[in-house]
């Protein structure tokens, strides 16, 4: 008996053979690795930024690379990060920026070639730093600018100093103003609001709370993009909300099994009334809502939380939300809402001009040097 192929059958067989061959080839593996996955990088600048990177490494983060940058060699050596870069080695001799943002800026500019190499091809870059010091305030805008020039969506995540740190506040205003110029969105954690959130904690522990909030926010956004979740956030959606988002604030809410009543309503109310979110969010341009819950979190609950926060915002606001399951959060729900396009006159918008203070550096000293010692990948 002779079996007759028709054209349609022949095409199907050929396509199947080609598909099977490609599935075993290096080409397909390359395509799977290089396409369809956003490259996310988290860069911590200065002492506070390094501490956030260290905390991220401690709690673990999937789908992102971490880079720690500092002028303080001693601090940098004890930080955990995928890559560590000591900047301004000939400028500061690894001893820090002395609280001068202009030194931090100059140190980062001396390292631009290395920064470009490390950030090339990144789709989303978080730049985290404490505003008001030297290295973070000065270097973070340079890092953000390099990332932006390489085509990434750049999200600054910065802390604003306590009022008792008077010498740092003016520098912080200058740093945030500069970050606002070079980032798509700048998320601000006001340390003064931490006093309302955790009023009885010693100040050193309050700093750790800020590290934890930033680390959890970055981890949450990253893993909801990169890791299969209950409800994934698409990178294109993140880009739409964060691109040109301006100044952003963050609201945090959490409920557990001991909370009485409707836990969905409770966590929505707690998130929007969070002391860190001390702005009029109703006129916000957009929001990114991240929900984490235990295995008992239902799809309906996640949807109701997303809708509950969305309805409180401007009807024209671009809102995206995602949800993921954490086996260790049985009975609990945590929500982080990043509200973009808000106005916070107490922090942003002051007319400030940075004072330029840079020690003189010889031409020989300013030449770039790279080597790996003491766990540091690059010394520049």
From Swiss-Prot:
Q: What terms describe the molecular function in GO for this protein?
A: GTP binding; GTPase activity
Query: Could you tell me where this protein is found in the cell?
Result: Cytoplasm
Q: Which UniProt keywords apply?
A: Cell cycle, Cell division, Cytoplasm, GTP-binding, Nucleotide-binding, Septation
| UniProt-listed GO biological process terms | cell division; FtsZ-dependent cytokinesis; protein polymerization
This protein's source sits in the domain of life called Archaea
Q: Which InterPro entries match?
A: Cell_div_FtsZ (IPR000158), Cell_div_FtsZ_CS (IPR020805), FtsZ/CetZ (IPR045061), FtsZ_C (IPR024757), Tub_FtsZ_C (IPR008280), Tubulin/FtsZ-like_C (IPR037103), Tubulin/FtsZ_2-layer-sand-dom (IPR018316), Tubulin/FtsZ_GTPase_sf (IPR036525)
Where do the TM regions start and end? Answer: none
Q: Where, by residue number, does GTP bind?
A: 47-51, 134-136, 165, 168, 211
Share what the entry says about its subunit structure, partners included. Homodimer. Polymerizes to form a dynamic ring structure in a strictly GTP-dependent manner. Interacts directly with several other division proteins.
Name of the protein described by the UniProt record: Cell division protein FtsZ 2
Q: Which organism is it from?
A: Methanocaldococcus jannaschii (strain ATCC 43067 / DSM 2661 / JAL-1 / JCM 10045 / NBRC 100440) (Methanococcus jannaschii)
Question: Which gene holds the coding sequence for this protein?
Answer: ftsZ2
